[in-house]
């Protein structure tokens, strides 16, 4: 059983984005099944279906997606950007919109407007956020590293791969390259001539209150 101390350590590490990977290894099949359980057994409003998840291990597709992610800006003027290397992970989980028209209405809005148009977008994004969080934490509890990608760029590539399906976000999951700092680009030191380039790391201060 996990102790509070060990769980807090996992929670702390789970927020960190891994930027390089050991691609000589593969995600264990039993772990992949557990990751699938994580995204299919998390809460959503009225247990409504909002998304589906594609777990990609095909390296050709993963590298195609990665090439389209040159949106991490490290210099604003003149603009210089590099790719989001977290997408080069051993496995990439892609969250895609999925609305089951066969479901009957579960809310008043769905009853009035139909089960497709009646869904509230904010409920959809909440559901995806919860599922992505479940997946991220589960991956870390299994011993993997992760990195989120918002999938807001490279639309032509996403259209080619996924068709007109709406992509919410992606999560790279896998084994880290133990020879590098986690924020070193996967392709360093050959990355665009940027020797020793390291992604920046930002912090946040979440205010927590306790009312008794």
Feature locations, PLM:
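N-terminal amphipathic, basic helical "cap/leader" segment at the start of enzyme domains
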Residues: 1-100, 208-212
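C-terminal helix-cap and adjacent tail motif
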Residues: 2-19, 168-212
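Short glycine/serine/proline-enriched coil/turn segments at secondary-structure junctions
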Residues: 44-47, 138, 179
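Short hydrophobic/aromatic-enriched beta-strand-loop microsegments
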Residues: 73-76, 166-171
């Amino acid at each position: 059983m996990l102790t509070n101390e060990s769980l807090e350590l996992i929670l702390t590490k789970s927020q960190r984005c891994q930027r390089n990977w050991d691609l000589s290894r593969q995600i264990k099949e039993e772990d992949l099944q557990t990751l699938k359980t994580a995204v299919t057994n998390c809460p959503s409003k009225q247990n409504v279906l909002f998304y589906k998840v594609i777990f990609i291990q095909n390296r050709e597709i993963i590298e195609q997606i990665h090439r389209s992610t040159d949106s991490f800006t490290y210099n604003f003027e003149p603009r210089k950007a590099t790719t989001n290397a977290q997408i080069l992970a051993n496995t990439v989980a892609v969250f895609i919109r999925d609305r089951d028209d066969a479901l009957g209405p579960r809310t008043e809005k769905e009853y009035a407007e139909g089960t497709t148009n009646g869904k509230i977008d904010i409920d959809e994004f909440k559901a995806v956020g919860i599922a992505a969080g479940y997946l991220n934490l589960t991956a870390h509890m299994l011993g993997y590293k992760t990195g989120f990608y918002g999938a807001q760029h490279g639309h032509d590539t996403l259209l080619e791969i996924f068709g007109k399906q709406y992509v919410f976000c992606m999560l790279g999951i896998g084994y880290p390259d133990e020879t590098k700092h986690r924020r070193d680009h996967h392709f360093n030191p050959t990355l665009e001539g940027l020797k020793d380039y390291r992604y920046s790391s930002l912090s946040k201060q979440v205010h927590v209150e306790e009312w008794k």
